[in-house]
């Protein structure tokens, strides 16, 4: 591998370039935090230029101002209870499946998080839950294009940069493709997650991880949970909330461990790349809606005529309350600007170039770690 495409700090890792290359001349390398970066093998490259033509960083797509905003949640009680917000990703996916379409979304397979094709309601169950890590796209591009060209209704759900990758890969608009982007704060690499878990769970066997979850309403909403078998065959259960006893959540929630491109994200604004955008409705002011929904509420931003028509078609499946678009924008930082590089973030990223993920975390957050441990010790003494 001898050269990169767009500048590495601008690369979103969508890998549309890798999938479009007719000579398989593009492979993958890793940055210092494990983020995936495409690299061209010049011995195989024939300079056809396809990779340059479909790169979203080199060829920006038009963005859409949100037309309507809704506070919404699914009417399916089972889906609502197991949802990490209002269950709207599941509701939209099931609506597409019920109409004979297919869905491409993100699922956890052990410790591997990747996009997959779903053609049944049972498949959609695998997509449930937030994944605070960048998913692998794999060969999703080719499969999605085949479905689109065959005339199936196709739903793609992903981060805005993944949506941009899909759109540029297809190179034209298709009426039977519906895109939904997740309002995104930034994505750490899967290697960052693995490094954090390897430190926390001694002798973890990645191939024998049976369950991975990033949110759990019963256990305090934001809870990193991992279950499986160690190398010696003994079972383990790992659970951590947003505290400083584990490195993953602090570095994620405070924006230390994202891709470089996340700090200059062109999609972290009120103009959106997709037909619809969904996420947590942090800025909701309607108290009546708060009282009506007891588990979680999604924000649904409808950005195109196609999105409007589809959302109207699924009203029987959801509770939906129109809200001012400005409420959603005011309450969600990532609808206003990309995540900032704070002093701690700069410190963490500098250290991570020269030492392990865990060491960089412990040095960067030493004051908070010590404070957290002191609180724990004091509480333990008081209980006695």
What are these model-predicted stretches?
Residues 1-2, 6-8, 39-43, 245-253:
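Short, intrinsically disordered, charge-biased short linear motifs at domain edges
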Residues 84-87, 110, 156-166, 186:
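Gly/Ser/Thr-rich loops at beta-strand to alpha-helix junctions
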Residues 3, 10, 16-39, 49-66, ...:
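Iron-sulfur cluster-binding cysteine motifs and their immediate structural context
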Residues 178-200:
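Short, flexible loop segments at boundaries between secondary-structure elements
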Residues 9-24, 46-58, 159-165, 258-270:
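Local cysteine-cluster metal-coordination motifs and their immediate loop/turn environment
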Residues 101-103, 152-158, 177:
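Generic beta-sheet signal
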Residues 99-102, 203-384:
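Long, compositionally biased charged/polar accessory segments in the mid-to-C-terminal portions
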Residues 1, 43-150, 321, 326-362:
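Flanking helices and flexible, charged tails adjoining ferredoxin-like Fe-S electron-transfer domains
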């Amino acid at each position: 591998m001898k050269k990169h495409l767009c500048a590495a700090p601008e690369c979103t890792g969508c890998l549309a370039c890798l999938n479009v290359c007719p000579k398989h001349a593009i492979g993958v390398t890793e940055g210092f935090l494990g983020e995936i970066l495409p690299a061209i093998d010049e011995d195989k490259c024939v300079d056809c230029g396809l990779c340059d033509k479909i790169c979203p960083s080199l060829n920006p797509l038009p963005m859409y101002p949100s037309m309507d905003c809704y506070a919404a949640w699914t009417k399916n009680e089972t889906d609502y209870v197991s949802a990490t917000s209002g269950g709207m990703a599941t509701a939209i996916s099931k609506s597409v499946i019920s109409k004979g379409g297919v869905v491409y979304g993100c699922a956890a397979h052990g410790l591997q998080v990747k996009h997959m094709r779903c053609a049944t309601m049972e498949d959609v169950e695998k997509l449930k839950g937030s994944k605070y890590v960048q998913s692998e796209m794999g060969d999703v591009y080719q499969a999605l294009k085949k479905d689109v060209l065959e005339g199936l209704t196709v739903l793609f759900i992903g981060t805005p940069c993944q949506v941009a990758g899909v759109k540029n890969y297809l190179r034209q608009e298709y009426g039977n493709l519906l895109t939904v982007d997740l309002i995104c704060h930034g994505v750490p690499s899967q290697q960052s997650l693995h490094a954090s878990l390897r430190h926390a769970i001694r002798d973890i066997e990645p191939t024998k991880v049976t369950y991975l979850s990033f949110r759990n309403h019963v256990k305090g909403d934001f809870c990193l949970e991992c279950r499986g078998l160690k190398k010696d065959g003994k079972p383990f259960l790992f659970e951590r909330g947003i505290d400083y006893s584990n490195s993953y959540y602090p570095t994620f929630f405070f924006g230390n461990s994202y891709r470089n491109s996340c700090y200059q994200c062109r999609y972290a604004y009120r103009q959106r790349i997709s037909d619809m955008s969904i996420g947590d409705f942090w800025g909701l002011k309607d108290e009546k809606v708060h009282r009506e929904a007891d588990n979680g509420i999604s924000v649904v931003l409808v950005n195109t005529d196609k999105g409007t028509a589809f959302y109207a078609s699924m009203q029987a499946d959801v509770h939906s309350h129109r809200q001012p678009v400005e409420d959603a924008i005011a309450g969600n930082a990532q609808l206003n600007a990309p995540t900032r590089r704070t002093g701690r973030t700069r410190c963490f990223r500098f250290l991570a170039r020269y030492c392990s993920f865990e060491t960089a975390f412990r040095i960067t957050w030493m004051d908070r770690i010590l404070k957290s441990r002191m609180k724990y010790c004091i509480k333990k003494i008081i209980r006695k």
